[in-house]
Amino acid sequence: FAAALAAVHVCAQPPASKPAAGAQVPLQAFLGVLNTNQVAARASLARIRDGWRDAYTAPMLELAGFVPILAVRVEVLAQLEQVTGRHSGGDLNPLYEWLWAREPGEHPDYAEFKAALYEQIDPRFREYFGRERKAIIRLDEIRWGGVWRDGIPPLKNPKMIPAKRASYLADDNIVFGVAIDGDVRAYPKRILAWHEMVKDRIAGRELNGVYCTLCGAMILYDATVGGVHYELGTSGFLYRSNKLMYDHTTKSLWSTLTGTPVVCPLVGKGIELKTLHVVTSTWGEWKKRHAGTTVLSLDTGHQRDYDEGAAYREYFASDRLMFGVPKLDPRLPNKAEVL
């Protein structure tokens, strides 16, 4: 993660010329705030302040976590706190909540800004954004999750074992059960939490199980629509604290919760992945009801701590959110499990 942050910093370069009165501050000025030359970085920030519009809040928030010079980062946060009237304390979520509660408009080059910013972390990220990409969700709600594309590795046709050989599982461990045309399988939460996606052939069908560790949603999709198979992966980005998938062919971003493309050339073409039934159960109850079930082996080809509850243990030990959402429902605590 630290290496990724370092990769964003831009080299010293002459500051962008000051825009004419009433003109938008150019894209170059926003990226200039990341300059490793303090004079140039502060000059870029000054141009943004002088021509400030609320539409600049989104790119400034995305820059805030990457500014390499502490003094400049403090100035960026001060500008954002002044505009929003909120104190961040180093947590950007309250500032994002202010933004999402409004319709501030969008810088005309905002999509290109996201492409230019995040391609410095992973060049493949540019494929998600850019001026020509259609979107049906707010781009300022798409946040980087801190990993590269497929940095959370999916499980592909993983090794399955009979229930009697799964000595690593306790009866109270949580599994996601699938039963299709007599093919019965269990995918332990403790394993999927590290991979967030399993691509498996179940009852002769190529299916994708998508698990979002942060929000706890497990959904099984048939990724073939109209005879076209969409090979899915983990994009590295989230929308409202829920992972966004991407497909290998069009590099579209897909909603995990709806199974539809949300940023891509396919938007508006009626494409929707078919959902299939998944049962969240204890291992003891699942194998009692399905004696012939198979279950994921610990031999995944990856080195992880697959103990129950090990994945994201510190995150789930508090009610603090890693990524904010536009609206919280106070009737339940943050991260409360709902089955």
Language model region names:
Residues 1-8:
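Bacterial N-terminal signal peptides
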Residues 14-32, 53-65, 88-96:
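Amphipathic alpha-helical scaffolding segments comprising HEAT/armadillo-like alpha-solenoid repeats
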Residues 31-39, 65-71, 101-102:
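Short coil turns that connect the paired helices of HEAT/ARM alpha-solenoid repeats
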Residues 61-66, 78, 82-339:
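Mid-to-C-terminal functional-domain signal that highlights helix-capping/loop sites
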Residues 19-23, 36-42, 57, 171, ...:
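Phosphate-binding glycine-rich loops and adjacent basic patches that engage nucleotide phosphates
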Residues 14-21, 39-53, 62-63, 71-86:
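Structural detector for internal amphipathic alpha-helices that build alpha-solenoid repeat scaffolds
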Residues 25, 29, 40-43, 55, ...:
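Extracytoplasmic/secreted proteins, especially bacterial periplasmic and envelope-associated proteins
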